Amino acid sequence: MNELQEKRIYILDTNILINFSVWIPISLNKTFWDGLEEALKDDKWVLLDVVVDEIRYNPELEKWCGKQKRNGLVKKIEDHNRERAVEINNTYKMIDESNGNSTADTYIISYAEENKLSIFSRESFRIKENGLFKIPEVCQRLNIVTIKRPVKFLESISFKN
């Protein structure tokens, strides 16, 4: 891993936390989740309030995220991030107007852009040319680094199990 990659800080998309909780349940792997929490405390990755707010129907993960929020480890989206998110959505249509899906994606991108952060998401590029834009495609156009592979993220936070 090169020096730049080591210093890269990632914002996690909601799908990452959900997938981690499915494949590495909190109740069965305390070590993993404690390590993730320690890395969050050490500012090695970013957890946004809009991501936490999207966690539903997963009591264990909701509880874990609630703990991070109570400990002051969750970063808040500010009004200027919301304004930039609207601009991003106006340029690259991301939000499904019928149900509001992907609203957090524009906030994640806005926050990453402002703070020179990278994004860890399992999203792929859009399939249909006239479909909604996805995180990797918008980030590519805005020169924001994205990754999809958990191993890259775990290496970047120096995770040890």
Each PLM stretch: what is its role?
Residues N2-L4, S21, F125-N161:
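Acidic, PIN/NYN-like endoribonuclease modules and their adjacent C-terminal/linker elements
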Residues M1-L47, E54-K67:
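Short, well-structured N-terminal submotif of metal-dependent ribonuclease cores
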Residues E38-D42, K67-L73, Q140-I147:
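Structural alpha-beta junctions
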Residues K44, E113-K116, N143:
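Residue-level detector of structured alpha->beta connecting loops
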Residues I77-E137:
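Active-site neighborhoods of divalent-metal-dependent phosphate/nucleic-acid chemistry enzymes
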Residues D49-N99:
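PIN-domain endoribonuclease scaffold, especially VapC-family toxins
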